[in-house]
Structure formats: C-alpha cells, structure tokens
Amino acid sequence: MGSESESVCVTGASGFIGSWLVMRLLEHGYTVRATVRDPTNQKKVKHLLDLPKAETHLTLWKADLADEGSFDEAIQGCSGVFHVATPMDFESRDPENEVIKPTINGLLDILKACQKAKTVRKLVFTSSAGTVNVEEHQKPVYDESNWSDVEFCRSVKMTGWMYFVSKTLAEQAAWKYAKENNIDFITIIPTLVIGPFLMPSMPPSLITGLSPILRNESHYGIIKQGQYVHLDDLCLSHIYLYKHPKAEGRYICSSHDATIHELVKMLREKYPEYNIPTKFKGIDDNLEPVHFSSKKLREIGFEFKYSLEDMFVGAVDACRAKGLIPIPAEKTEAAEESNLVDVKVGS
C-alpha cells in the first residue's frame, strides 16, 4: 500500500489510462494530484471527482503540455510522477506543431519539473507500442531493444503516423535527458489498450480496437497483427514498477497477440448481433501473429490477470452503458425481458 502521506502526480488524468490509474492509486492509499487541461470543465472531470476517496485524497491541477512550466506546481512536493498525457489527434492538419512538438517538449518539461521539485523519486512515462514496431517489414518478435522507423512513418503517413513519430522521438529525447541529469526514469510500453473505462467519451484506442464492430476501415491495418493489454493490467503495472526498487529502463506491457482474423472470430461468436466483417481488403487471409515480449516485466514479478475476451467484453459493455455504441434492437428487448439493465463497467 502507498503511504497516505505519499503524494504522486498523474498527468492527463481525465483520459482513458489516466483516470483508471488515478482510481487504482487512490485504492492503493496514495494522495493524487491529477493534472487536466481544464479543471472547471465538469463534463471532463466528473468521473474523477466521483471516485471513492476523491474528496480526501484527490486534487485537480490545471496544466497543458503546450504551456511550458505549467506542471511545475503540481509536481512540487510529489515523490512520484506518472506521465500519461499525450496529444492524440489523428486528424490533425498540422501534426508537427499540434502533435509531435508538444509531445516531445511536454515530456522534457515534465523531466525538468521533476528536477526542480527535488522531491521526485521516480518518473514513470507511458510510452507506446508505436515506438517499437512501426517499420516496413514486421519481425516475428519485438522487445524493449527495438525502435520504430521514424522516417518510414513520415514517408508512408499511415493512420496514426504522427502519434508513432511523436512518442518515439519524445521517448528517445527523454532517455538522453534522464541519463544526463541522473533522473530515475522508466517507460512502460503498452500495446493496444482495451477494457472498461471511466471517461464519458470513446477512448481513441477503442476506436481502433473495436473497429471491426464500428466499421472503422482505416484502422484495420493497425490491428492486422495486433497485440493487446487490459487497461487494468496496464495501470497495475505502472504502480508495480513505481514501487519496485529494481525497476529500470523500458518495459513492454502486452498480454495477448491476435491477428485481425482471430479477433473477429472471437467478436463474431460473442456478438453475433453486430454484422462484423470476415474479409478485409488488402489484408491476407493467412497472417502470422507478431509477438510483443513482456518477458522483462514478467521476470520482475508482474502477473497479468485478464484474458483477451475479458478486455473486449469489458470494453463493449462500457461503451454500451455509456451509449457510445448501439445495442441492436433484439438485444435490447431480450435484456429488458430478463431485467438485465445493470451493466457492470468493471472494477
């Protein structure tokens, strides 16, 4: 358990990963300083303020990656920082200035704030699988030594390219700065994060993960040879590595691999009411899975709790409960008949 007097800061706290991490940190006994862009926007922060222990152990702080020095105050006095915030605008018209530069400068600004505070014991950065395997030819297995090909991303400009570039360049710049300035810095590299969630809107990773249900064809390529982790496993790994005295370097956090064909087979069996496609234009019927190795994370003692089915059922249930994906009419009628109106969003 965290000490009740131990304060930690979570950036991007209202988002998909950030809000679940805040919930788990509060449960573990930490006092949490949550940074958000606008603490007065009730629609964006209500799910944080409604959390158990929020009244006594949670404070909201205004900070923005584009505003240099805006995290200093929230980080001052904290013993740990979880930097989760990242610009996620795949439709940006000016990706260099709206996504890439703010991501790099924002992470360096967090590192500088940790230095200035003089109280921060460890900084945990949520990186991305997009820093590892985005390259022309996929390897069968990836580990923490691999880095994405930034020039390949810039030339091909696939869906999400600016996110992959921004996270890769930011993490590389941060490692250089952390080593030069002797900062205890670790990065966690999640693959596609799936599961139930607290935020009121559709998380970007579920737009991708649930793309066969949502018919988001431009995202099929991302999950062609997919790797997945449950949101709860990811957040628990953050706390585990923060507390572990020997944690160092990069850690891939991924529990399952599945090709798009394996994924839709499971989704079609689970949700026959959605007309989920079985053929995907430009995607071979015979795909080999691509594996992201979490060997390093497992070897330090972390154990994953959730199955691939757990992730997707949790995600679909949460989306339905929040009205983000339609429930087909026949399913609604069946639910009403059996009084199944209480949809669990997970814990």
From Swiss-Prot:
GO molecular function annotations of the record: dihydrokaempferol 4-reductase activity; flavanone 4-reductase activity
pH relationship of activity: Optimum pH is 5.75 with dihydroquercetin as substrate.
Query: What is any Pfam family matched here?
Result: Epimerase
Question: Which InterPro entries is this protein grouped with?
Answer: Epimerase_deHydtase, NAD(P)-bd_dom_sf, NAD(P)_dehydrat-like
Key word RNA-binding present in the record? no
The residues that the entry says bind NADP(+) are: K44, Y163
Which terms are listed as keywords in the entry?
A: Flavonoid biosynthesis, NADP, Oxidoreductase
Reaction(s) catalysed by this chain, per the record, are: a (2R,3S,4S)-leucoanthocyanidin + NADP(+) = a (2R,3R)-dihydroflavonol + NADPH + H(+); (2S)-flavan-4-ol + NADP(+) = (2S)-flavanone + NADPH + H(+)
Which top EC class is given? oxidoreductase
**What role is this protein assigned?**
Bifunctional enzyme involved in the flavonoid metabolism. May use dihydroquercetin, eriodictyol, garbanzol (5-deoxydihydrokaempferol), dihydrofisetin (5-deoxydihydroquercetin), dihydrokaempferol to a low extent (5%), but not naringenin, 5-deoxynaringenin or butin (5-deoxyeriodictyol) as substrate.
Which family is this protein grouped under?
Belongs to the NAD(P)-dependent epimerase/dehydratase family. Dihydroflavonol-4-reductase subfamily.
The protein here is known as: Bifunctional dihydroflavonol 4-reductase/flavanone 4-reductase
Q: Which gene encodes it?
A: DFR
